[in-house]
């Protein structure tokens, strides 16, 4: 059987960097990870509730977290900031209050910044959300995959592979369907590949979406 390594972990230190930057004592490490998860969940819930169109489409590419002794710096890389109802300044202020309440940390300041992603459809997380939305609306999975590939062409990517697994179209037996366009050299470490795995709940059960995007070669 083929052993599939995570493309992001495989390239750490070469073309990929960590999304979280902080240090902790071994006994406090698990608490730090849980704190990161709380911050991410809180931000995703807030963005979902405050979208102009209540579609469940968040458009968050990634959330970067940097921790110091007295400061937590959170950078949200978002694809479509104009979808948010509140103005940027007021929205960030409200979000900061929400996250601060959730964390319950008195000694540390929280600073949240929103950065717009230049080419949103070159981000696998945003593409996976788009496909998930299509599948929820009962669009044919092949049509959704082909449309996602068309969208990545706008972002000047060199290749993309999309895979959907589970009870596709409500069939009794689960299967895997995939489509590839261009080159996706998974074994080349210098190849800058972005990856995302995403689970979507449909009326037939949970489907898994995996996306690999080949951006460039160093």
From Swiss-Prot:
<feature type="domain" description="KH type-2">
    <location>
        <begin position="47"/>
        <end position="118"/>
    </location>
</feature>
<dbReference type="InterPro" id="IPR015946">
    <property type="entry name" value="KH_dom-like_a/b"/>
</dbReference>
<dbReference type="InterPro" id="IPR005704">
    <property type="entry name" value="Ribosomal_uS3_bac-typ"/>
</dbReference>
<dbReference type="InterPro" id="IPR009019">
    <property type="entry name" value="KH_sf_prok-type"/>
</dbReference>
<dbReference type="InterPro" id="IPR018280">
    <property type="entry name" value="Ribosomal_uS3_CS"/>
</dbReference>
<dbReference type="GO" id="GO:0003735">
    <property type="term" value="F:structural constituent of ribosome"/>
</dbReference>
<keyword id="KW-0689">Ribosomal protein</keyword>
<protein>
    <recommendedName>
        <fullName>Small ribosomal subunit protein uS3c</fullName>
    </recommendedName>
</protein>
<dbReference type="Pfam" id="PF00189">
    <property type="entry name" value="Ribosomal_S3_C"/>
</dbReference>
<keyword id="KW-0934">Plastid</keyword>
<dbReference type="InterPro" id="IPR004044">
    <property type="entry name" value="KH_dom_type_2"/>
</dbReference>
<comment type="similarity">
    <text>Belongs to the universal ribosomal protein uS3 family.</text>
</comment>
<dbReference type="GO" id="GO:0006412">
    <property type="term" value="P:translation"/>
</dbReference>
<dbReference type="InterPro" id="IPR036419">
    <property type="entry name" value="Ribosomal_S3_C_sf"/>
</dbReference>
<dbReference type="InterPro" id="IPR001351">
    <property type="entry name" value="Ribosomal_uS3_C"/>
</dbReference>
<dbReference type="GO" id="GO:0022627">
    <property type="term" value="C:cytosolic small ribosomal subunit"/>
</dbReference>
<comment type="subunit">
    <text>Part of the 30S ribosomal subunit.</text>
</comment>
<keyword id="KW-0150">Chloroplast</keyword>
<dbReference type="GO" id="GO:0009507">
    <property type="term" value="C:chloroplast"/>
</dbReference>
<keyword id="KW-0687">Ribonucleoprotein</keyword>
<keyword id="KW-0694">RNA-binding</keyword>
<dbReference type="GO" id="GO:0019843">
    <property type="term" value="F:rRNA binding"/>
</dbReference>
<keyword id="KW-0699">rRNA-binding</keyword>
């Amino acid at each position: 059987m083929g052993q599939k390594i995570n493309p992001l972990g495989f390239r750490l230190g070469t073309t990929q960097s960590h999304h979280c930057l902080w240090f902790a004592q071994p006994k406090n490490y698990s608490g730090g990870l849980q704190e990161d998860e709380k911050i991410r969940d809180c931000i995703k819930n807030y963005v979902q509730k405050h979208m102009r169109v209540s579609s469940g489409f968040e458009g968050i590419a990634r959330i970067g977290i940097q921790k110091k002794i007295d400061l937590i710096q959170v950078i949200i890389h978002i694809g479509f900031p104009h979808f948010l109802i509140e103005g940027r300044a007021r929205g960030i202020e409200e979000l900061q209050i929400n996250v601060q309440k959730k964390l319950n940390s008195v000694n540390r300041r929280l600073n949240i910044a929103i950065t717009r992603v230049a080419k949103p459809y070159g981000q696998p997380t945003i593409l996976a959300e788009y496909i998930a939305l299509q599948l929820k609306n009962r669009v044919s999975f092949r049509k959704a995959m082909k449309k996602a590939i068309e969208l990545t062409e706008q972002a000047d990517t060199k290749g993309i592979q999309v895979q959907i697994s589970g009870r596709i179209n409500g069939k009794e037996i689960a299967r895997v369907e995939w489509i590839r366009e261009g080159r996706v050299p998974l074994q080349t470490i210098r190849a800058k590949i972005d990856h995302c795995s995403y689970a979507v709940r449909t009326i037939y059960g949970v489907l898994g979406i995996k996306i690999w995007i080949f951006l460039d070669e160093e």
